[in-house]
Every structure is written in C-alpha cells, then in structure tokens.
Amino acid sequence: MDRVIIIGGKGSAIVIAEQIYDAQIKVGNIEFLGFAFDDESFGKEINGFPILCKTYNAYEEYSKYNDVKFIFQLYRPDLIKERINLLNSYRIPINRFYTFIHPSCVVARSAKIGFGTAIMANCVINPNTIIGNCCTIHSNSLIGHDTELGDYNFFAAHSVVGSNNTFGEGNFVGLNTTFNNYITIGDYCFVGMASNVIRSIDSFKKVYGNPAKEFTKEIKPL
C-alpha cells in the first residue's frame, strides 16, 4: 500500500485529498496521510485531515519511508511558472511522486501517465495518450486518443481535449473547456473557462471565449 502526502492545502489539494480518501475506502490500496502546508492560520488540520509538516521539509521528514509518496498541488493560474520552480526547489526525486487515478476512471491500456499526475473521478483517457509528470486532470474530463500532454498541465473539471493534439508544459485550462482535434498548445498558456479552442495557441498566451481569442488582462488569483 502506498501512503500519500499532498503538498498544498487549498482548492484542488482538498479535492484530491477527498478523492484519495474515497479510493482508500472503496479499493483500499492507498492511504492519504495528510498535507504539507505552510499557512499556519489553518491550524493543525484541513477538512479533518492533518497538516503534517511544512512544504519545504516534507521530503526531509518522510523520505525514509519508502511507501510514502507525494502529490504537488500548489498551482495557481497566475503563478504557474513560479509554482513549478517552487516544486523543483524541493528536490524530490520524480519517482517519489504518486500517480493517482481514481478507480472510476477509464484509462486505455496503451495510455502512458507520468509520475505525480492526479486524474480525478469519471475521467476518460483514450488510447495512445501520453500524459507527463505532475499534471492534474479534474473530474469528468476527457483526453482524446493520440494526444500528448507535457508536464505540469492543469485541467479543471469537464475539460474535453480532442484527438491528435500536443500540449507543452505548464498550461492552465479552466472549467468546461473544449479543444479541437489536430492542434498544438504551447507552454504556459492560460485558457479561460467555457472556452472553445479551435486553433493552435503559441506559448505564453492567454485566451478565452467561443471561439477562443487572445486577451491581455491580468489573471485573477484563485
């Protein structure tokens, strides 16, 4: 049995914690230990799960336990690159990150999923899909066949990604967003909720709408 610590404590970190706990009850091959989180205003627990340590010393505290692995969930749409740099500063070996797939998901045998990626309830990952390390795919999302996602991509719930697409790294995709087939999304792009992306997007672009178009306003922190 693997035991999991989530680095983070707000938003998606809590969602993933609850889904790991759900899998723990239904399947029993995983145990959620608690959070590594720095905000002391939360006290000693979040939603009944303990805060075990700070983010920066999580690996130091638990590296001696070979069955303890980590999931990183400190992503923010306005600070994606900074948060990826923060993750890398912890110097946690990639094989100590846990790949979580909720038992309700359908994942093709030919799909390849990297370390530290979390795939939430009722997602479908179609054949020959490649998903990189430390990605997050929230509930009821679909990744089309022959699509490749780089590292650190975040998809909010109800995302639909068409087939034969390529995503770089560090992209943030809002709720209920749809992507056409045969398009390329660069690195560190932001796609606003309910967007319909019908064309490729260059790196570092912010888009939203139907069809999705570029915008320049600052992204509000979540």
Predicted segment positions?
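Cofactor-binding loop segments of dinucleotide-utilizing enzymes, especially the Rossmann-like FAD-
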Residues: 9, 37-38, 75, 102, ...
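Short amphipathic alpha-helical segments
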Residues: 17-19, 83-86, 131, 202-203, ...
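Glycine-rich hexapeptide-repeat left-handed beta-helix
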Residues: 9, 151, 156-222
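Left-handed beta-helix
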Residues: 77-85, 89-147, 153, 159-165, ...
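A general structural motif
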Residues: 1, 32, 65-67, 94, ...
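Phosphate-bearing ligand-interacting subdomains
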Residues: 42-101, 106
